[in-house]
């Protein structure tokens, strides 16, 4: 009688990060579409260095860049959200409950939408509406580079053996540096995207940069 070979069924259950792959691949496809179709096969150097008056299709490029930034940022920070507020968790349309990535994406998307709407109204209110299109054209370049860095951080965070608890403090340093750099980038950019008068610049930085970030922090982490 032949010996029966016994196999030990060891099932390894890895952390399921397939959703991260799908989101990041979607972000990359959006950028490929933007560069090849919207920007008419522009290379990276031409896209980043193009001048406003030589550009076209700025609005769709800005929308895609904002979407990718919101998605990649949500993927990165969602794992640090302590809890979903009860009034959000209790809202279950069609029996589905919002998870942390969904909650984070909604909050960050609302953050971008409301801040953009307020920035538009700000430029119109001070009589500087012509600068609005130059503003979001310049902002697109900044957020494009930021989103690429966020995608790299997402890959590192989910697919490399790092201490995620310790990494959180480094993310805070990173985003603090990004914020400070962004303020100076807007202040001293050659396109002069901020209002000329200093008190309007101060008002913009306080009300449309600092205050919204504090509210975003409160909604996500407090």
Question: Which residues does each predicted region cover?
Answer:
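N-terminal juxtamembrane cytosolic/stromal segments of multi-pass membrane proteins
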Residues: 1-62, 86
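Alpha-helical transmembrane segments
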Residues: 14-31, 95-111, 165-174
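Hydrophobic alpha-helical transmembrane segments of multi-pass integral membrane proteins
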Residues: 28-30, 64-80, 106-110, 114, ...
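Membrane-helix interface motif
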Residues: 38-43, 73-89, 118
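Cytoplasmic membrane-interface regions of multi-pass membrane proteins
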Residues: 38-52, 121-131, 188-192
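Hydrophobic, aromatic-rich alpha-helical transmembrane segments
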Residues: 56, 60, 64, 93, ...
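Alpha-helical transmembrane segments with an aromatic anchor "belt"
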Residues: 87-158
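Terminal transmembrane helical module of multi-pass membrane proteins
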Residues: 153-222
